[in-house]
Amino acid sequence: MKEIMTDIKLRTWKMNKGRLAKLFIILLLISIMTMLFLYLKDYRVKKYMLNNNKFDVIDIDNYEVFLTGETHTMAKSDEFKKKFFYYLNKNAGVKNIIEEVGFCSGLLLNKYIQTGNEKYLNFYMEQLKGTMAYNKEKYEFYKWLYEYNLQLTEEDKIIIYGIDIEHQPLTAIMGISTLIDINKEVPQSLEEAIEYVKKNDHNAILYLKLAYDKNKEECEEYFGDNFIIFENCIKNLYPEETGSDMRDKVMMDNFSFIYSLNRDKKFFGQLGSEHIYQDYINSDYTSIDEVRFGILLNSNNSPVKNKVYSLLCVYQNINDNSPSKNSFDYSLIKNYKEDIFVDLSQENSPFYKKKYFFKDKKRAWVTCDYIQGLMILIDSNETTSL
């Protein structure tokens, strides 16, 4: 009996051992197949990225607004901005630039690129002292833009528009001064306001509003063709939008106004990356409840719905200090050694099927719901303060 029991135990042990071996082999095969599937999946994505890495593959005729999103402190941002705008200007006829500056302040930048008068650019930059925008790269970009504008015919001249809230009041006042005709008699209702504008005094903001509210007709007569610009300046000095996302709402208000003056024209703008996403998302700086400029541009009420191309700049640094690591997944691009552009919106793009790059899992959308292009910038230095 004892021998029989021992034999049974031995057979049971061998059977269990065989089952375990089979189970191990099955699990091993599943692991290998999973790894192979993931490898092939990543391979297909990476192959797509390498096959769609030229600006020429963008369907530029399909878009009216091209937005690029930067990290403000990265030096390569303005280098890319110059390169991409040059391409769009030459190939898509884009000549309107929207800047992340106040509407009134944008008048000053535009005056500079039309005239080359250094006092406008120098004043603009001086008012940025103490901010991350006070840097050599930004200054040199505007210098380049003026030189480039010189080469263009009158009908092809580049125009800058500010769309942001006014951050620098003195810059805003000097911007408004570019609307003044010094040879024109000033009506009594505007005398004090214009004097403050000429002195670049903070009081100009209050007195311009008082003059506008008191006698709109005289303002219209004095500013002439520039009156609608002046009127929008007043709206920007006293914005009605509120909330943590008021900036993006103001951006949309200003874009709608600018678009009404340039219907069916194309626009380019390089803004902070938070402003360009076309759907709600959690990121390092903004929550999922806050509306973005890109969302508003692509909304049902927008004149450019479905005509917006959002391109995100990401900065892959070899020393592992890449920006936005908490919200951006660098795994697909970690082995790149040179700057590379990727258009994400081609036919059969994997980025229409899954959300790559973004770590936010609260919304089960796909990459192209947020952006349609990616610019990978390798080892960018930080901007150089002036």
Which residues make up each language-model segment?
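N-terminal targeting leaders characterized by basic, low-complexity, disordered sequences
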Residues: 1-7
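Residue-level detector of intrinsically disordered terminal segments
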Residues: 4, 14, 32-34
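Short, isolated positions within intrinsically disordered regulatory regions of eukaryotic proteins
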Residues: 5, 15-17, 148, 369
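N-terminal Sec-pathway targeting helices
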Residues: 9-30
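Compositional signal for N-terminal targeting/processing segments
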Residues: 24-27, 31-386
